[in-house]
């Protein structure tokens, strides 16, 4: 029998999921995106060549893999066509490998306009969205007024639905945010221009997944963003608009949760965050916080967002938050990424608890952003190492201090580290236990 594996982020995104998904897809038949949209940025480096994907699953560069976009993904036709064009220009036969659920909500120009207008109106207190219309598209889905991919194939129905929802949103754009209305005819024409292209890729995702499972083939589910950005379990309201946790697989792909065999949590050897929101172990943000260790992490780790290009805030590893990620996702094993970025640091710190305002200590995360902003991290110090770990592919090749750091993460979280990444390239990895084995 095959195995069904979930790969997801355990922090605030940017943990290195793209590389890991690409690495594991040599054993998978399907790679499935189940939430998010083109706000995700998954970077792959293969033989020195860099590819950044935002919407299409990271398995698209593999000949043996079909890539699936499930119903939980909000889909921008414009972004999809741009990504298809980029890959086809490099000789990748995307349309032969990509399958899409007709139930995917569409991201249309008025969603982007709303997203940008709202962030602008928040002034110096933005949520930190990518401005790509993700949140407004999910809002329309929940409000049951959104258009879906399947609507594109009935032009009359699409036009009627578009006219209704556009009237609703244009009223807000013009009268509340004082920006221009979105044009109906251009929105309609642009959508119809890609309808036939998308129609050729439509599939019943639930049926496909079940038949693949019954055939004994492996399925890999690729998460976007990270656990601490989950709409329900993250640092609300500084979160994304979807469920980034393992439960999102069932709802966002239509796959029964009892069929999941392994959840791989991607954990960076330190912590980063893009945009606004609490960050207890933060060291460096390029503005108010200027700790040299944090700058080292950002510079050596090339910490700039793959989607937005924004500087990522950096800080020490937070084991309290990691324990919560383990609880929510029932994580089977970790993939520890960017261990090499810690090379050269004399002392390392891991947050093992939070001190509250009244002086009490807890190892439980707060329920919302307001609680996070009031905690002080409690650190455990460990010796660092001076040796170079870039490209090391066996535990024996790591310095003792690095091995001790890995073991301490396992002890604090109760989860084994099954994969260690020591560089951006596919080959700069040690697999201690393969999730598909």
Curated annotation (Swiss-Prot):
**Where this protein primarily resides, as one coarse class?**
cytoplasm
Q: Where does IMP bind?
A: 14-17, 39-42, 130, 144, 225, 240, 310
- Write out the residues that bind Mg(2+): 14, 41
Under SUPFAM superfamilies, the record lists: P-loop containing nucleoside triphosphate hydrolases (SSF52540)
Question: Can you quote a single GO CC term?
Answer: cytoplasm
Q: How is the cofactor bound?
A: Binds 1 Mg(2+) ion per subunit.
Active-site annotation: 14, 42
Note whether Chaperone occurs among the keywords: no
Keyword Manganese in the entry? The reply is: no
The UniProt catalytic activity note for this protein reads: IMP + L-aspartate + GTP = N(6)-(1,2-dicarboxyethyl)-AMP + GDP + phosphate + 2 H(+)
Localization annotation: Cytoplasm
UniProt KW keywords = Cytoplasm, GTP-binding, Ligase, Magnesium, Metal-binding, Nucleotide-binding, Purine biosynthesis
PANTHER family, per the entry: ADENYLOSUCCINATE SYNTHETASE
- Give the family this protein belongs to, as stated in its UniProt record: Belongs to the adenylosuccinate synthetase family.
What is this protein identified as? Adenylosuccinate synthetase 1
Which organism is the protein's source?
Answer: Pseudoalteromonas translucida (strain TAC 125)
Supply the source organism's classification: Bacteria, Pseudomonadati, Pseudomonadota, Gammaproteobacteria, Alteromonadales
**What gene name is listed for this protein?**
purA1
